[in-house]
């Protein structure tokens, strides 16, 4: 099991990779990470998405570019960090990133 510091490092690496690969900056999330910490920022992001039932605004960008691996929701599902999240948060992320049959 990894701790919050490791999660923070992984999130910052994902944000950096996203910026380099897809030119997506995760700017609002970065601001929240600075203000509240990585775990709280991601939980806040998930709460907003779950309450509005809207896809994250970056979803289409990453899906169209075949880079779903750059979604924060995939980091939530990482076995090293899944214990940091509620069952509801994990289920939401799993539903979001699981490919649907045509």
What are these regions (language model features)?
Residues 1, 13-17, 28-29, 43-44, ...:
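Charged, low-complexity surface segments at secondary-structure and domain boundaries
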Residues 1-21, 95-99:
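Charged, compositionally biased N-terminal leader segments and the immediate start
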Residues 3, 20-22, 32, 77, ...:
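A general marker of short, structured functional hotspots
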Residues 4-8, 26, 38-39, 68, ...:
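Short amphipathic alpha-helical segments that mediate assembly, nucleic-acid/protein binding
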Residues 10-13, 24, 50-57, 70, ...:
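Accessory DNA-engaging acidic/polar modules
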Residues 15-64:
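Amphipathic alpha-helical packing elements
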Residues 61-102:
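Amphipathic alpha-helical binding modules
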């Amino acid at each position: 099991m990894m701790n919050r510091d490791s999660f923070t490092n992984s999130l910052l690496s994902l944000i950096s990779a996203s910026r380099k690969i897809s030119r997506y900056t995760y700017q609002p999330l970065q601001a929240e990470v600075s203000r509240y910490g990585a775990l709280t920022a991601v939980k806040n992001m998930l709460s907003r998405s779950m309450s509005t039932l809207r896809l994250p605004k970056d979803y289409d960008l990453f899906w169209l570019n075949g880079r779903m691996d750059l979604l924060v929701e995939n980091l939530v599902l990482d076995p090293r960090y899944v214990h940091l999240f509620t069952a509801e948060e994990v289920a939401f992320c799993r539903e979001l990133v699981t490919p649907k049959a045509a």
